[in-house]
């Protein structure tokens, strides 16, 4: 793909050059641990700390009160060439405690020992109760200016650039859990705007398990490991989770999303993000509009398949964290468009019969198109995980003028919870003064003292009104940029503990989601429910879950029941008949391949000229080539030698988005079961390394593009991959193979990772299928090209495409 056809790569290179002024990683392969290559021997010549890697940056060097300091980031890092204690005193030894003789007792006066051990004993802070496992990056948000008619927030203005820090996370797992578990993902963004910090604290799923925050401890207690054994870790496939969600049916919609491919994303870079709740925007004249926030990834929405996710969790539990950091280091900067669905701010706060205050409901994009308002680009990795990713503190109440909350009862509870949790996790009320949390707007509050106070406040009158400090700080009005809550009218009523009747429908929207899936996506949902419920011990919970599924779709219920070996419950009340929302499907479009990882399998006898050409072409296209060989080192000699990044012992298919073979590699000398279990019990005389056959067969089974030339077809045949199967590419040259593989990568997977034949298609009455129609979904140009996966029936006309021009609701 040429640069002219790859605008994302051009943007990334421009941003890298202008924003960071950096060069890419060596040989285009990310993952270098430090900014300099270490010598074999221990360095002994004193020198100062190395600079960070070119892809890394830290928090802006503003003061605890938001004032620019002019200091460089190196000024707030460690300095000097010699080891010191915490007070700056140089040390001559840090390997031996101070003792009464070489074999004597350690002396109490050893202040260095006490300081070093005491600090180590207190290095850990309480992990987040939820979203403990996370990864983050710095970036910039550029407003399009298109939201000016409905929102006065300055950062949404045309071409306004705002620094951001984004943290992605799982929900249930502890800090050390695996990345690729089936779970909801957090997508939290901190905007350092000129008017203060704005936090958009969202998820990759647009609905939530509960409608009221008072139930949050219940759903999390149910999803977390069982309290007696502390197992299973980072899993929902256990009795307590399914006990709760089958008894508490408002969780049905979110549970269905979790069981879909959305629960096992391929990458943080390939996730949608959602604000979940309905917010209220305010324009310059005081008019209001209700909105839902969406993040739309420029790389599309893609997932792993379940077996792949499980293998990845064992082979590389840091897969998503590594993927994000490596992509940024390689210059393939992830991008998302921020968009809003807009609704009139009517007294009922409903739209097309959907209660906008219910966080378990969506508004289909066909009814309210997502209007883009800005572009997010992540262009730098953190310099220190603890100081930035671990200590960042988000809060739904961090708002700026122009953005207000609604009466969503879950959102209202979150407004309390986020501040409360930081008091324990970050050790007091001054967490906003931590460098990563510092606003870039001047702070003149009257909050004083407390644990970890780092601001040195002046004056004698931290109260209002005062005269001793000249009356400062003064109150601002709306004209001076003050945050003024919308004077929304509160309907008269009695104090009650109940939900509105509109919250009672727990099954129409889950059915809408199910009907919106293609057949292969439905197969994955069936498999997920069958797996998760199959892990439950109590049959009563499985039977109860089937009763819930029967209220979503009869076919779904019957398939899961068959997998569990249980009878499907009899049909109950008639099922809802919502119009499907094609925008909910992940299947059918093509996307840029930026940051995709391609494994090139070769050895010294392979077509090394083709390998070199392939590497260069992949790098030019914004992808990452990794050479896989029987052993490490280099292939070939001289200046043209090709560096090996992975061996048959260290590689596994889950790392690659595509695999190409540049010949028939020799069997590795370590292809013995005693050395590497992946080799199995294959005979030493076997022509092809069994670990390579495993890699290729897994890639084929997971629907990945596979290519071969120069005899590599023999390996494909030995691995059981039909040479004429969809997604299997053979050719006479590396260039010929790469062109087809790149095209396949644009669709992510062949058949969405389901190459083996599916069951016969469902009846037309069950899946709304029929001949001769077209699949549509919302895209920037309004339509999506035809997709052969699931045609619409004439009796079920797809919704009209959204308008091309942005239209805002009438106030």
Kindly give the residue locations of the regions a language model identified:
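Short, solvent-exposed beta-strand-terminating loops
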Residues: 343-347, 790, 803
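Intrinsic structural disorder/low-complexity segments
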Residues: 781-782, 792, 805
């Amino acid at each position: 793909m040429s640069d002219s056809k790859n605008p994302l790569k051009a943007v990334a290179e421009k941003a890298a050059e202008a924003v960071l002024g950096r060069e890419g990683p060596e040989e285009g392969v990310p993952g270098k641990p430090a900014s300099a290559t270490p010598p074999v021997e221990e360095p002994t010549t004193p020198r100062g700390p190395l600079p960070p890697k070119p892809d890394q940056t830290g928090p802006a060097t503003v003061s605890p009160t938001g004032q620019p300091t002019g200091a460089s980031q190196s000024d707030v890092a460690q300095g000097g060439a010699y080891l010191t204690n915490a007070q700056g005193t140089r040390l001559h030894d840090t390997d031996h405690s101070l003792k009464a003789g070489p074999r004597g007792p350690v002396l109490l006066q050893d202040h260095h020992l006490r300081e070093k051990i005491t600090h180590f004993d207190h290095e850990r802070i309480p992990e987040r109760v939820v979203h403990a496992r996370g990864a983050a990056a710095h970036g910039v948000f550029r407003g399009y200016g298109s939201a000016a008619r409905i929102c006065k927030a300055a950062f949404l203005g045309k071409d306004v650039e705002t620094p951001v820090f984004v943290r992605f996370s799982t929900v249930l797992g502890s800090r050390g859990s695996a990345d690729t578990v089936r779970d909801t993902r957090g997508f939290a963004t901190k905007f350092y705007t000129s008017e203060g910090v704005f936090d958009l604290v969202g998820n990759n799923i647009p609905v939530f398990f509960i409608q009221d925050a008072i139930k949050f401890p219940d759903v999390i207690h149910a999803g977390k490991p069982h309290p007696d054994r502390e197992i299973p870790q980072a899993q929902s496939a256990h009795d307590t989770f399914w006990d709760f969600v089958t008894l508490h049916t408002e969780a049905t919609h979110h549970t269905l999303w979790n069981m879909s491919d959305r629960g096992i994303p391929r990458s943080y870079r390939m996730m949608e993000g959602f604000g979940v709740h309905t917010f209220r925007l305010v324009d310059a004249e005081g008019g209001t509009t209700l909105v839902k926030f969406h993040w739309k990834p420029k790389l599309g929405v893609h997932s792993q398949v379940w077996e792949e996710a499980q293998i990845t969790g064992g082979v590389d539990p840091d897969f998503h964290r590594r993927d994000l950091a490596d992509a940024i280091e390689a210059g393939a900067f992830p991008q998302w468009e921020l968009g809003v669905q807009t609704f009139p701010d009517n007294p009922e706060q409903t739209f097309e019969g959907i209660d906008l205050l219910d966080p378990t409901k969506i508004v289909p994009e066909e009814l309210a198109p997502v209007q883009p308002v800005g572009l997010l680009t992540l262009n730098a990795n953190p310099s220190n995980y603890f100081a930035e990713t671990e200590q960042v503190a988000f809060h739904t109440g961090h708002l700026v003028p122009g953005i207000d909350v609604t009466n969503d009862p879950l959102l209202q509870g979150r407004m309390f919870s986020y501040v409360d949790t930081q008091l324990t996790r970050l050790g007091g009320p001054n967490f906003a003064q931590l460098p990563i949390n510092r606003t870039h707007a001047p702070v003149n509050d009257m909050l004083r003292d407390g644990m970890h106070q780092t601001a040195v406040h002046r004056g004698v009158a931290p109260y209002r009104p005062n005269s001793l400090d000249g009356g400062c700080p003064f109150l601002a009005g709306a004209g001076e940029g003050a945050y003024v809550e919308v004077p929304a009218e509160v309907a008269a009523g009695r104090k009650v503990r109940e939900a509105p009747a509109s919250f009672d429908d727990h099954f129409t929207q889950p059915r809408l989601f199910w009907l919106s899936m293609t057949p292969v996506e439905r197969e994955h949902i069936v498999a997920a429910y069958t797996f998760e419920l199959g892990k439950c011990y109590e049959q009563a919970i499985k039977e109860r879950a089937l009763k819930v599924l029967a209220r979503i779709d009869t076919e779904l219920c019957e398939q899961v029941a068959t997998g569990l070996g249980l009878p499907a419950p009899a049909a109950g009340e008639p099922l809802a008949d919502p119009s499907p929302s094609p925008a909910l499907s992940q299947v059918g479009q093509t996307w840029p391949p930026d940051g995709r990882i391609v494994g090139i399998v070769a050895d010294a006898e392979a077509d090394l000229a083709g390998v070199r050409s392939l590497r260069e072409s992949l790098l030019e296209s914004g992808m990452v080539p990794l050479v896989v060989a029987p052993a490490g080192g280099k292939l070939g000699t001289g200046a043209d030698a090709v560096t090996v990044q992975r061996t048959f012992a260290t590689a596994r298919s889950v790392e690659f988005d595509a695999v190409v073979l540049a010949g028939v590699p020799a069997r590795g000398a370590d292809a013995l079961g005693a050395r590497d279990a992946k080799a199995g019990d294959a005979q030493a005389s076997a022509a092809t390394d069994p670990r390579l056959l495993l890699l290729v067969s897994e890639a084929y089974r997971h629907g990945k593009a596979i290519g071969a030339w120069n005899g590599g077809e023999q390996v494909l045949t030995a691995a059981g991959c039909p040479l004429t199967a969809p997604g299997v590419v053979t050719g006479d040259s590396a260039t010929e193979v790469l062109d087809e593989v790149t095209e396949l990568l644009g669709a992510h997977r062949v058949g969405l990772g389901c190459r083996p034949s599916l069951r016969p298609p469902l009846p037309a009455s069950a899946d709304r299928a029929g001949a001769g129609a077209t699949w549509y979904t919302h895209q920037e140009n309004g339509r999506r090209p035809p997709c052969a996966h699931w045609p619409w029936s004439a009796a079920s006309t797809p919704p009209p495409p959204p308008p091309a021009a942005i239209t805002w609701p009438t106030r």
